[in-house]
Amino acid sequence: MIALRLIAVTLVVAMAASTTWARSFNKRANFDPSCAGVYNRELLGRLSRLCDDCYNVFREPKVATECRNNCFYNPVFVQCLEYLIPADLHEEYQAHVQTVGK
């Protein structure tokens, strides 16, 4: 009886650990693995939204993908930044790219 309880507890702990790991893995699954800097969901989300907004303006599929290339460190991202974001915030966005990038 004690052995059965021990096995049941072990299974429950193992399942909880694997679920937590899977949830943690899935959080990062949406972002480019080339982003080798600090993982910050808020910054990555903000940069990604800029690319989404840029795609919504230009409606060209390549804009959405190229904007995110090389962890947002590319000419398309810069063009989107210049087009959509006020000039006084450009340095802030470039700092975000440096934080999450290489």
From Swiss-Prot:
Segment forming the signal sequence: 1-22
Pfam families assigned: Crust_neurohorm (PF01147)
Coiled-coil segments on the chain, per record: none
Keyword Transport in annotation: no
Keywords from the UniProt entry: Amidation, Carbohydrate metabolism, Cleavage on pair of basic residues, Disulfide bond, Glucose metabolism, Hormone, Neuropeptide, Secreted, Signal
Residue list for modification Valine amide: 100
Subcellular localization(s) per the UniProt record: Secreted
GO cellular component: extracellular region
GO MF terms held by the record: neuropeptide hormone activity
Disulfide bonds: 35-71, 51-67, 54-80
Domain of life per record: Eukaryota
Annotated function: Hormone found in the sinus gland of isopods and decapods which controls the blood sugar level. Has a secretagogue action over the amylase released from the midgut gland. May act as a stress hormone and may be involved in the control of molting and reproduction.
Annotated family: Belongs to the arthropod CHH/MIH/GIH/VIH hormone family.
Name of the molecule in the record: Crustacean hyperglycemic hormones 3
